[in-house]
Amino acid sequence: MKNLKLFSEVPQNIQLHSTEEVVQFAAYDIDQSRLFFASSANFVYALQLSSFQNESAGAKSAMPVEVCSIDIEPGDFITAFDYLAEKESLLIGTSHGLLLVHNVESDVTELVGNIEGGVKCISPNPTGDLLGLITGLGQLLVMTYDWALMYEKALGEVPEGGYVRETNDLSVNCGGISISWRGDGKYFATMGEVYESGCMSKKIKIWESDSGALQSSSETKEFTQGILEWMPSGAKIAAVYKRKSDDSSPSIAFFERNGLERSSFRIGEPEDATESCENLKWNSASDLLAGVVSCKTYDAIRVWFFSNNHWYLKQEIRYPREAGVTVMWDPTKPLQLICWTLSGQVSVRHFMWVTAVMEDSTAFVIDNSKILVTPLSLSLMPPPMYLFSLSFSSAVRDIAYYSRNSKNCLAVFLSDGNLSFVEFPAPNTWEDLEGKDFSVEISDCKTALGSFVHLLWLDVHSLLCVSAYGSSHNKCLSSGGYDTELHGSYLQEVEVVCHEDHVPDQVTCSGFKASITFQTLLESPVLALAWNPSKRDSAFVEFEGGKVLGYASRSEIMETRSSDDSVCFPSTCPWVRVAQVDASGVHKPLICGLDDMGRLSINGKNLCNNCSSFSFYSELANEVVTHLIILTKQDFLFIVDTKDVLNGDVALGNVFFVIDGRRRDEENMSYVNIWERGAKVIGVLNGDEAAVILQTMRGNLECIYPRKLVLSSITNALAQQRFKDAFNLVRRHRIDFNVIVDLYGWQAFLQSAVAFVEQVNNLNHVTEFVCAMKNEDVTETLYKKFSFSKKGDEVFRVKDSCSNKVSSVLQAIRKALEEHIPESPSRELCILTTLARSDPPAIEESLLRIKSVREMELLNSSDDIRKKSCPSAEEALKHLLWLLDSEAVFEAALGLYDLNLAAIVALNSQRDPKEFLPYLQELEKMPESLMHFKIDIKLQRFDSALRNIVSAGVGYFPDCMNLIKKNPQLFPLGLLLITDPEKKLVVLEAWADHLIDEKRFEDAATTYLCCCKLEKASKAYRECGDWSGVLRVGALMKLGKDEILKLAYELCEEVNALGKPAEAAKIALEYCSDISGGISLLINAREWEEALRVAFLHTADDRISVVKSSALECASGLVSEFKESIEKVGKYLTRYLAVRQRRLLLAAKLKSEERSVVDLDDDTASEASSNLSGMSAYTLGTRRGSAASVSSSNATSRARDLRRQRKSGKIRAGSAGEEMALVDHLKGMRMTDGGKRELKSLLICLVTLGEMESAQKLQQTAENFQVSQVAAVELAHDTVSSESVDEEVYCFERYAQKTRSTARDSDAFSWMLKVFISP
């Protein structure tokens, strides 16, 4: 669905030597982009194609040409002409048989051969190694570029005595013979005469180029003009012939390499027998076929296009018959057509493909004098199918469509120079026009309109167009008869007036009048016109080079500014469209341009470098574009938010729009992978349709619904509270229904639940919605890769926790159903669904509703209205069973203690009666409390079971106790329900026994005390090591003095064995009166001050001496340990600094070699291992394993883990984690808080005993150790984050001095006695 548009036309004139001289042949130099023309006067003219681009718009002047004369005999003339790129020379054949090579640069002509009968056709092989030549005698010669003849063949098949063309019959225009090569040069086709049935006919022959073998030939036909054109891709050979016994116009037929005809089409209307085809040319892309058709009063250049097994006439350009126009395609540019006339007027026309689908998704496909109209919003109907058609008086060249403000108009420029207009009815009535054909009259115009190149509606009564005047083909335009002296290109406004009243629901095809109201000469070519939707009666005009200017109706062109910067595309963009976007509440134009290299620019800035097509999508009805649709050459369809483009959030350049196949899952889901290679975006369906229309290379249409557009449409519908539209979108595109709730938060949805239910107005759909609810935010999970543009009030922007989403939403839906929807069976089933799908399911409430319906049925109520408004109980129950697990429903029915209901549930769930009837019958025979108890036990409702069994009576107390013992959480409730004091004591004792089993001895002891089980309480206290509790219970048990003393000795030993010598000392002193034993225990507990106090209390010298000797011994041992620890601190710090220095050097080396540190094996490291000591009782030794002890292997067996734990006290020298392990060990050597307290107690004890020297020595040694450890840790911490280790900066002595001077007053050194602190 595309049309071929002429977007640039540059005519120029060759200044010939005489008026009688005419241009006859042309050749193209691909390397230097030159055209060579040979005239009837044997002159050769050379033109540079770049001169066409440098000329001003529509300038008609003599071109600068290079002229050379071919020196041949009088009476001889040029009959064949071509350019040999390999020799950089022109190859010329004459009527007398001369074969000349003319070097263009040196202007030297060389005779290379003389052909008998004259040269009729010359055709070089596309691969540049062979040359085909046809003589005037009908002989085929194939030679090399060295002029060596490879073979000679006869083209015709004329028997003896048949007619043979004389050599003097050779002329320029005799035609009849040609050579056409396949694109790869392996085969070529010729057309030769055949004498058959007494008359001369022609047939196509296909030859193999290397051997000259005849591969195949066609049937004999009445081929005209000897036209033969092999498609460059090699698929088809085009030829022209007239059908036998048929007076209609000739047909263009297509043949395969095997000589069989594949298809054909007529070049004109069937009734027009005066038309004939003079020339055929394929473009380099093999998709366009251009031909010169000679009509009764004019010659026409026609361009055909093939799609969906149909040939479309896409362009027709008329010339006067006397002009003798000829065409050729630019070999390097598939859409550039070069035309020249006999008088030397050369025109270069640039075509472009434009989508036939307009902004409102209506397709207008041009086919000759018809326009095929299809509204794609009604049906995806690929051409040549259509809804209805419009017929015109001549071929259609260009169209412009207007669809705004309830007006739908079409302006059509015809090949005869006339304008036609059509006004359509409202689009919703177009279905009634199906199959109709409307004949459109030309408009009345009294002025010369010229040849339109661009056409655009400004408003419903005004057209803006670019028109060319002065070209030779203007003489064939109907408006060319009006006197005008205009030359060049003009920008002009055309006023359109309709003198007939438009009839609603009808197509208006006549009564229009056009007149030029404004006209201004253009100094440079206009390449595109685009309507400005943000400003009334205005447009944007693009000039050559990409400069974009603004135009207001009936005014001069004024420079357009966007953010105070001129809009100028980086390159010329033939495809220009303007989108109206919303920029913070202000509508602004977004000017998009696409050049022929695939560069897409927005407001002059490059957005994408590999774009193949683009379009706009609007989710609103106010023509504000919300998304930009980009299809790349990689066949990825991107959906870009226009707000991101305005804010600059979209990455510029083609990097953003190229997807790495290995990372596609990680990319933002804003693109769609198009499965058809080479497909193009031809249009979109705006609004809630949210569709992108693609046309594949095969011609069929595909409509896709990108998820991002669909979600955007849903968001927009929800923002406008259009719940039904949003629901239908979700349902149609299989979007998760939770989107409706999650987009703006489920709490916001609760406020709109009534509107949702009323708008959807379909209980089956509401049920479907309810069943889809789940406790998660799908915008953060399933659709987290899509960005949602939230609209509406701020209340809708609340995002909530999903913990109770389902229950809250379904409750709101249920309330809306009950209050705003009339009673009906469907409503009741929907309500049951909301209960069943709640989280957790409200099964009991659902069963109660069903139970009430069943009771109503059993009562045989006469309220028929009530019966009709509810489903039957069986239907409701089956619906509930369909939603939920039948076992859960059966258990819930049992939980209601309704055995009849449970039986009905079991029957409807298709359970075997043998499974449930005996059980239900057994329950029915039980007392009510016992039945409830049995049911509660089955359902594991133990609290209710306990209440029921207690209410069953005293006789069931053993069952009560069994239940409580099996479910210990019931003990508190049991104590509350059981009022008998004796039975309460039984419950308490059982509870305490349970606590003993749980190893909760202290709680068990307390519980035993509550039930007066003192002996068990004493054992419980003893188990938990609470000697005070044991002795308290012993007093309650009224034990004797000896028994208490014995118990105290036993407890003293047990407590000491548990590692609590201080508490054992307390028992020995207070209960056993063992002074010596108590002091020894205090010494073991390192409670030096308390031991000395007890010794002084009992004034025993021997005991004081024991304390003194123990204190001195401990002080001596600590001094030795602290000195050893100081040495280890120095050792670890030295090793750390060495390792750190080596690591830094290696890292620098690896960085220079661009290698990773992880891959390096430190071969220079030592293999020795350093073991940690236990250090002293006053230091904290870390037992964490270093990273160095962890193997780099991925295998992690349990045995290896255990082996690592055993080796966790070691540091492997040279391992990757040695640095941090050394730092961790230095930190682990710090003094603990308990050690500091015990050290201070020892110092005070020594001072009290008069051992000041020992105390001072101990304090100084301990201080030195602590200063060393703190300084070493600080030094290591500073070097970890440093990139170098400077020995002067990171000096241990400096850190130690700093620590000693600043840290003495800190809490860490509060254990020190001030009297011993050195200055």
UniProtKB/Swiss-Prot annotation:
Disrupted-gene phenotype: Narrow leaves and reduced root growth that results from a decreased cell division rate and a reduced apical dominance. Increased abscisic acid (ABA) sensitivity and drought tolerance. Higher resistance to oxidative stress mediated by methyl viologen (MV) that blocks electron transport during photosynthesis and by CsCl in light. Accumulates anthocyanins.
Primary gene name: ELP1
Location(s) in or outside the cell: Cytoplasm; Nucleus
Lineage summary: Eukaryota, Viridiplantae, Streptophyta, Embryophyta, Tracheophyta
The protein's assembly and partners: Homodimer. Component of the elongator complex which consists of ELP1/ELO2, ELP2, ELP3/ELO3, ELP4/ELO1, ELP5, and ELP6.
Keyword Nucleus: yes
Primary role: Component of the elongator complex which is required for multiple tRNA modifications, including mcm5U (5-methoxycarbonylmethyl uridine), mcm5s2U (5-methoxycarbonylmethyl-2-thiouridine), and ncm5U (5-carbamoylmethyl uridine). The elongator complex catalyzes the formation of carboxymethyluridine in the wobble base at position 34 in tRNAs. Promotes organ development by modulating cell division rate. Required for auxin distribution or signaling. Prevents abscisic acid (ABA) signaling leading to stomatal closure and seedling growth inhibition. Involved in oxidative stress signaling.
GO biological process: 5-carbamoylmethyl uridine residue modification; abscisic acid-activated signaling pathway; auxin-activated signaling pathway; cell division; cellular response to abscisic acid stimulus; fruit morphogenesis; leaf morphogenesis; negative regulation of anthocyanin metabolic process
Main location (coarse class): cytoplasm
Coiled coil segments of this chain: none
Protein family per UniProt: Belongs to the ELP1/IKA1 family.
GO cellular component labels: cytoplasm; elongator holoenzyme complex; nucleus
InterPro entries, A to Z: A-sol_ELP1, Elp1, ELP1_b-prop_2, ELP1_N_b-prop_1, HB_ELP1, TPR_ELP1, WD40/YVTN_repeat-like_dom_sf
Highest taxon above the source species: Eukaryota
Tissue: Expressed in meristematic tissues of in roots, stems, leaves, seedlings, cotyledons, guard cells, floral buds, flowers, siliques, and shoot apices.
Biased composition (Basic residues): 1201-1210
Keywords in alphabetical order: Abscisic acid signaling pathway, Auxin signaling pathway, Cytoplasm, Nucleus, Repeat, tRNA processing, WD repeat
Annotated PANTHER family: ELONGATOR COMPLEX PROTEIN 1 (PTHR12747:SF0)
Region annotation Mediates dimerization: where it falls in the sequence: 884-1319
WD repeat locations: 73-112, 171-217, 272-314, 316-339, 521-561, 640-685, 1265-1302
Stretch list, region Disordered: 1188-1215
Name the UniProt record assigns to this protein: Elongator complex protein 1
UniProt pathway: tRNA modification; 5-methoxycarbonylmethyl-2-thiouridine-tRNA biosynthesis
Keyword set includes tRNA processing: yes
Composition bias, Low complexity: 1188-1197
